[in-house]
Amino acid sequence: MKDAAQQQEPVSARQTQVHRKSSKPESPPFIFDNPRIQPNTYCMVKLPSENFRVVKLIPNQTISIGKFGSFQVNDILGLPYGYTFEIQEDKRLRIIQEGVDDHDYVVGAKGALLEPEETNQTLIDTSESQTLSMAEIEEMKKQKTLSGKDIIDHVIKGHNEFHKKTAFSKEKYLRRKEQKYLRRFTPQPMCSSLLLDFYLEKDYKKVLDMSQEMLALLLSMANVRPGGKYLVVDETTGVLTAALMERMAGEGLIVVAHENEHPNLDALKYLSMPTELQDRMIKSINWLQFFEPEGEEEVPEKTPEQIASMKPRNRGAYFRKRNRWLELQNVNDLVANQGFDGLIVASTLHPASIVDRTLHAIGGSRPVVVYSEYKEVVTEVSQLMLKDLRVLAPSIWESRVRKYQTILGRMHPSMTSRGGGGYLVHGTRVFPNEEVNATQVRNRKRKREDGDKTKSSETEGKSEESVEPDTEQSAEPEAKLETDADA
């Protein structure tokens, strides 16, 4: 019997192991990073002037990038992101090898270390130092046989004071000319950080002046992870929601609360996310449906016979209403059962009121993060959290990144940079225990401290009394000695 039982144990273990394997999801997490350029997707094009341009890669079309030229979309499809292309004559492209094709028109300009005694003291850099006129330079730009590197070579040769410049000055001069004359571009995949930079340059009000470092700090403070359920108030044109989807890797739920008929998530179209993924992860609810769920009209389920008898147009409308009503019921269940893993607010509405009215839907030990471009707003939210026993340890955060120049052995911060970036207030959702009265514990502690003080004072008094008789006794022999001496 024991042998039979021992033989059956591995079988049951294998069955359990097979059952565990089958319970795992078959499809891997969704990955947003596509290493190759795909057609009919949006792409961020980095120009030599350090500016960005968002373009849609439609096959068999030509994309113009301003003064830097134009190129055919078919020439870059299927190639990896990150390559730098140079536009040649007849709109042909050539891949630039970084580190090999850079600055080879000036021998020794790059790689030469700057000596400590080298200065620009004898340099007189005026407009007369350049022998080429603007008309001649514009004529060279119109010639299709000359590349941007050839134009820079002619400009350097026509500069009478270039050889007097230090290596550091030469490097900065070359970079300025590259930004002006090189016909190059670098396609980069769309992501939330690049999309945020694009909106900051285009219209920073659309993203509430949020910087990259503050977006990263917000995601870290909110503990955004795959499989989480988050209540989000997003008025950054959908950039915040896109960042959450990237961090969650296609697993979890994002409930976007809004004040209009539909939420403004226009930025999601630039990331080329599948529509099925957006419908599965993102659910929207307006404030009226959030605060008064009983006012929503119920859409009852119909029998297959009733559905078959409906017209195709009415059948589609019924399924849309029914699915929408079921989504609202699921969201209301999360609100009632405190099923959200975090509250993230980035809105122009009154954040203190939003936190006060939505905090009941957040689970225990879950983060509450509020972003605002103004310090006064987050200070008001912090004061509200300090008075509210449902939030523990609120704190205000600020993060700034400063760019540095690293050229030929020198490193110093950039002299110009944009301000702003916003502020965060972070707290932890807790459930206070109303039965515990901390005042009694504090009074007992005070009584205990007072008792210790009285005991210590009594012991000090006794020690002083014990010392006084000794001093009197020690003084008596001295008096006797004095009387003997007088005698």
Curated annotation (Swiss-Prot):
One cellular component (GO) term of this entry: nucleus
Compositional bias segments (type: Polar residues): 1-16
GO molecular function, one term: RNA binding
Keywords: Nucleus, RNA-binding, tRNA processing
Acidic residues biased stretches: 466-475
Top-rank lineage group of the source organism: Eukaryota
Pfam family, one: Gcd10p
Presence of keyword Cell division: no
Keyword Hydrolase: no
The family this protein is said to belong to: Belongs to the TRM6/GCD10 family.
Record's subunit section: Heterotetramer; composed of two copies of TRM6 and two copies of TRM61.
Record's protein name: tRNA (adenine(58)-N(1))-methyltransferase non-catalytic subunit TRM6
